[in-house]
Amino acid sequence: IHHIAVVAYLSGTTITGKFDTAPSNTNARTTWKEQVFSSRHGYARSVAFHDQRLVFGGSKDLPNHLFMSKVGEFFNFDVGTGLDDESIQIQIAENQVSEIKAVESFRHLSIFTSEAELYVPTSENRPLTPSTISVKRQTSYGSSGVNPVDFDGALVYLTKSKGAVREFVFSDLSQAYNSDAISLLSQEMIGTIVDMSAQREAPDQAEAYLYTVNSDGNMAVM
C-alpha cells in the first residue's frame, strides 16, 4: 500500500502527487482509496471517548456516519475482520438523512442529529462490538449546533428550532430516553443561545447551575 500526498488537482480524473515510497509498479491503477477526513472531504463534527474507544461523528461528506477506534488504541481505525475489539464504522440509516451534531458518552453513547436523538444500547452481556452495535431513535426534536451539557443526571441540549432546552434522560420504567423541556418556566430568558455550560455542586455549594449564553451577550441561569 502506498500513500500519495496530493499536490495539484488537474481534472476529475487527473491529479499530481508525491508517493511516500517509490512504487514498484507504475502502471495505471483503477482501485484506490481516499482518507475519510481531509480538507476536501471535511473533518469530524464531534468527538468523544466511550468504552475505551475514540468516537468521531459526522463530516461534510459523511454527515450520518460514526467512526469508532479499536478498543484501547485511539488512533487505530482498521476494521480488520470484525473482531470484537476492532474498529466500528457505521452509517445511521433512517428515512431521511440527518447530520450528526454531537456524540456524548453518558449512560450510553448518545447521538444528537439534526432530526432526532438516538443512543447505542449496551449492557454487561452485550458490549459494544462490530457485530452487536445498533442505533435506536428515541425522540425527534433535532439538535442545534450547540454542544449538549452533562447536567443533573441528564444530557441537556438545545433543540433544532432553538425554541427550547431539553434534557435527554433515561427512564428505568420505560427503558427508553425522554426529552422533557426544562425551559418552559423561563422561556423569556432564552434568546439565541450560542453556548451552554454547567457549574457542578461543590463542598461549600449544594446547588448546580446551567448557564446559557445568548448571542447578545446576555446569560440565563437555570
Model regions: which residues?
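Beta-propeller and closely related beta-pinwheel folds
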Residues: 26-206, 222
